[in-house]
């Protein structure tokens, strides 16, 4: 559900300020935030978009549940309870990625491909894309090597899902603006 772990909510800043205006087609990166995370851990990002209603940039086939407030709810981005977040969608709004700083003994595998890589036809909230399953398998192999005493040189490998859907490599997406 929408309930956050107590004490986990962190305010973000953009160039030291609490808000950012992002032009159409542009990207904004927040300043770094201290928040320890584990491999495979779900993260929540709460946003407040003031003023008039705007259409979000979104990943419509995200196959995960996102939570939203009713229009006119005000700024509840700091609320860790599930109370205000009464609506659900299965899209990811506004975000392209969340980057983490991994240990020096980590590495990553980037999975680039079509809608199968993106997660089409997987189960809502099950995290059963092939990249998720590969990540779990690599984690189990890493843990087994550490338990066997072979872990001194063993590297943790993250799997990055860079799948696309709807031919978004060569056009704006499934529902481009007219």
Regions found by a protein language model. Name each.
Residues 1-112, 117-125, 147, 151:
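N-terminal secretory targeting modules
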Residues 114, 120-178:
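Catalytic cores of extracellular degradative/oxidative enzymes
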